[in-house]
Amino acid sequence: MSCIYKGEVIESELSKNSKGGTEMMRQRLIDNVGKEVLENVAVHLSRPRDLYEDVPNILYCHDLSEDPENVILKDGGWNKFQHIVFVTAWQRDQYIMRFGMPYSMCSVIHNAVEVKYDPKEKDMETIRFVYHTTPHRGLELLVPVFASLAKEFDNIHLDVYSGFEIYGWEGRNAAYEPLFAQIAEHSHMTYHGVKSNEEVLEALDKSHIFLYPNIWKETSCIALLEAIKSQMICIHPNYGALPETAANATIMYDWNEDLNHHANYAYAVTRQVLTQMKNDPNYFHGFTFSDRFNLARNNVASFGTMWNTLLRNITDAYKR
C-alpha cells in the first residue's frame, strides 16, 4: 500500500487518503526507529508495488494471506524480500502454510498502541458500550444484539464510531446507511461517524464494554488492543488472530459461521456479563483491575526496540 524508502514515505493510490491501522503502524515505525536505520532500508507495508535494488526490501504484512494482492509471494516470490514482518504469529503461520517461505526469514512484531493501562474507578451509572472499527467487521450483528439487550437492561448505551472514510472510501458507506440510521433512531445508541483517534480514545476511557461480534477475519486488532488497555471488558469470538491479540485479557466465545448462531452466542455471553455487573457492584472493577490488561508486548517502547534491532541486523547482513 505504501513504502518507507530510505526514510521517506512513498504513497500509493490506496494509501494516500487512508488513516487506518496500517498507516498508524507506519507512523509508529517512523517515530520510533532511528532515522539512520530507516535510511538504509525499504519497508513495504503490504501490497508492494516497486522493489528497490540499492537497499534491502522488507515486507511488513498487515493483510490476510489469502488476499489476492499477495500474488507477488507465489512460486517463491518471497525470495525478492530480505525479510518479512508479521503482526501476529497466527498471521505468520498462515503465510508460511500458503507460500512456503522459511520461518528464518520471518519475524513477528505485534502492533503497538499509545494507550497506557491505568486502572481507575469508572462511573457505573450508565454502562457504556463502544464500537470503533469499520462497519463490515461486525456492526450488522452488534446492533440487533444490543437492541435486544437494551430491552432488558435500561442503563446501557452504545456509542458507534465507524465509517469507511478512515480508508478514504466514503462511497462504501452507502450499504450501511440504513444501519447507521437505525442506530441514530435508537434511544440507547448514538452514531458518531468517523472521529479522530484521540476522540475515540477519550470515549474508551469512559466506557465499559467492547462487544465485538467479529465476522471479518483479523490478522490483529488495534481496536481490541485499545479497548483492553482502556480497562474495558471485551467480548468477541475466537476467530482469526483475535485470541492471540486478546492475550487472555478478554471473554471469548466459539466462532460460528451461521450469523444467527453467532449473534445468539454474543447476546448470551453479554447478557451474562451484564447480569453479573447488576448483581455484583464490584464485578467490573474486579475483572478489569488486572496485570493482564497491561499488554506489555503492545507498548510503543517494545515495538520500537524490536524494529530497531531487526532493521540493524538486516542492514548489517546486507552490507556483508
Feature map (PLM): residue ranges:
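Donor nucleotide-sugar binding/catalytic pocket of nucleotide-sugar-dependent glycosyltransferases
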Residues: Q82-I96, M101-D118
